[in-house]
Amino acid sequence: FITESNSAMASPVVAVLKPQGRGVRVCVNYQYVNKYTLPDQTPLTDISEIIQRVGQANFISLFDAKSGYHQCMIVPEDRWKTAFCCDAEMYEWVRCPFGLRGSGCTFVRAIRKILHKVRDCTESYVDDMAVHTVGPWQKHLSDMRRFLEVIKASGFTLNLSKCTFGQSEMKFVGHVIGSGKRRADPDKVDSIKALRVPETKKQVRQLLGLFGHFRDYIVNYALHAKPLTDLTGKRVPNRVPWGEREQNS
């Protein structure tokens, strides 16, 4: 994934603790590089459209791209920009690293290009890919075979431990979908219940973003969310007041 470098610049390496004490993740801080990188405006597919298409399927199989962004190669003339120092040596990335401003969009475009030939039976959201079939089991096997053939031809690899095959209902992009039905993922709902009370406008906006993910399951969502939406108004101080009205919403 990396090679030795003689670049005229290098970004610093930082260590980040993983959640639940699962160790340390070593990352490169590309803050300076990102500052001078033009933004990539590649949009993500609308989740509601994905749910609508995949949710009608009789059979669904999910696939996870192994190592995510690392599957995308960096053109040789740009690799020097990714240089970093570690253990008194300098290295640069051969494959796309995490942390670069354009890594996510580059990966999304690559996945879409790969799946273009099987777009009639596949959907993707970042590194999650679904093969969905409306019809009998044999047709789903045929759809999976077509999917795996284009993945193999692309050179991309899959994380087998995170793949699930031939289910009539499964979790995908925060929802449980299949056989024409859908509902909120219970694990996602539980994680929202465990969130701390927001203290600033920014935290309220983040909370509303999470709640909005499930607005289709809440009758009169806008009415219920209004006390929180009001906290984002210009006349409300940055340190937001939180009372019974907000808690009950």
Locate the predicted segments by residue.
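Retroelement reverse transcriptase polymerase core
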Residues: 1-249
